[in-house]
Regions:
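Rossmann-like AdoMet
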Residues: 1-68, 72-128, 132-133, 279, ...
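Conserved RecA-like P-loop NTPase ATPase core
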Residues: 42, 137, 220
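A mobile, often basic/glycine-rich helix-loop segment
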Residues: 136-185, 231-240
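A residue-level signal for conserved active-site and pocket-lining positions in enzyme catalytic cores
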Residues: 11, 137, 268
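Generic detector of well-ordered alpha-helical packing
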Residues: 68, 97, 142-145, 221
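Short catalytic/ligand-binding loop motif for oxyanion handling, primarily in non-cytosolic enzymes
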Residues: 75-76, 145-147, 225-228
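A short SAM/SAH-binding and catalytic strip from SAM-dependent methyltransferases
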Residues: 128, 132-155, 193-198, 202, ...
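Long, Lys/Arg- and hydrophobic-enriched amphipathic alpha-helices
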Residues: 181-308
Length: 308
């Protein structure tokens, strides 16, 4: 019998885990897709943001950017291809637990962005670096892959999800876990379930600790109130993916599929400012970046051609 968060940790990051065996985001030959894989414009918007923050921080040199959960390096590549004002000051650190993806990422970024340079402003690490710095920590769809503990409300108190031979096994939760669940969702009805996202909270604290001055920028799917989880079936907020399709039970064939959980933003430390990704991209000038293409398409409507 294995506690659910420990089971997911092994299924994703263990020796034979989903990410350890080379699974990744992407359009072809991958199991899921994230914003950097849909368009280079996402990286261009990140670059615009980095340029602005660099100016707000009075142009520090070095200006350190840490990307956690960097995967195959797609976002890092697009940032280097787009960044302007802070290009000479930027020192980029990709943090990725998967050995295969770290190798792919370093090769992708160096060959696409620094082919003719003997030294590159780039490092690839397995974990967040020690010490503090001035810059930005960013993470795109990282927190949803940090395994949660899962609780269920019953007449006798809170139970905690374990996995036993590919099936659910609910056990009485430790006192401290019951206390946390009751505080987070005091109105939960019997039979409803709730994630405790302790690993996400720890990661946020670690990321903030690395910043002497700067910003923490996180993109993820989630909800502003944990109460929302108790109003939805567990299968709606705890999901699996394989070959770009929903992939059924997370307890079967561990290591063969991605396991993801919506993020409860109210369980994260601090007072995060929350907005939709669409709103954030608009603030970084996405519409102005696509204005030429939009006008080209509209002008070609009467007689469409390849340029449109």
């Amino acid at each position: 019998m294995t506690r659910f968060d420990h089971f997911v940790e092994e299924a994703l990051y263990g020796q034979h885990g989903f990410y350890s065996t080379g699974q990744r985001a992407g359009s072809e030959g991958a199991d899921f897709i994230t914003s950097p894989e849909t368009s280079t414009l996402f990286g261009a918007c990140i670059a615009e943001y980095l340029d602005r923050v660099w100016q707000e921080l009075e142009c520090p040199n070095p200006f350190v950017v840490i990307e956690a959960g960097s995967g195959p390096g797609t976002l890092c590549r697009d940032v280097f291809l787009s960044v302007q004002d802070c290009s000479d000051a930027i020192r980029y650190v990709m943090v990725e637990r998967s050995d295969p993806q770290r190798e792919i990422a370093f090769r992708e970024v160096t060959t696409r962005c620094f082919m003719d340079q003997q030294e590159v402003p780039l490092a690839v690490l397995q974990d967040l670096p020690a010490g503090s710095f001035t810059g930005v920590v960013l993470a795109n769809e990282l927190l949803d892959n940090l395994p949660p503990r899962v609780m269920k409300k019953t007449e006798k108190g809170w139970l905690e999800l374990h996995v036993e031979q590919g099936t659910e096994d609910w056990q009485t939760a430790p006192t401290e876990a019951q206390t946390m669940a009751a505080a987070i969702a005091p109105k939960a009805q019997n039979g409803t379930c709730l994630p405790l996202q302790l690993k996400s909270a720890v990661w946020i604290n670690r990321a903030l600790a690395t910043l002497e001055r700067g910003r923490l920028l996180v993109f993820d799917y989630g909800v502003e109130s944990s109460d929302i989880f108790t109003q939805r079936p567990m299968g709606e907020w705890l999901r699996t993916y394989r070959n770009h399709q929903r992939s059924g039970s997370p307890y079967q064939e561990p290591g063969s599929r991605d396991i993801t959980c919506d993020v409860a933003f109210d369980q994260l430390p601090g007072r995060p400012s929350i907005c939709t990704q669409t709103e954030w991209l608009k603030d970084q000038g996405l519409y102005s970046m696509t204005d030429w293409a939009r006008k080209q398409w509209q002008s070609a409507l009467p007689s469409p051609d390849a340029a449109a």
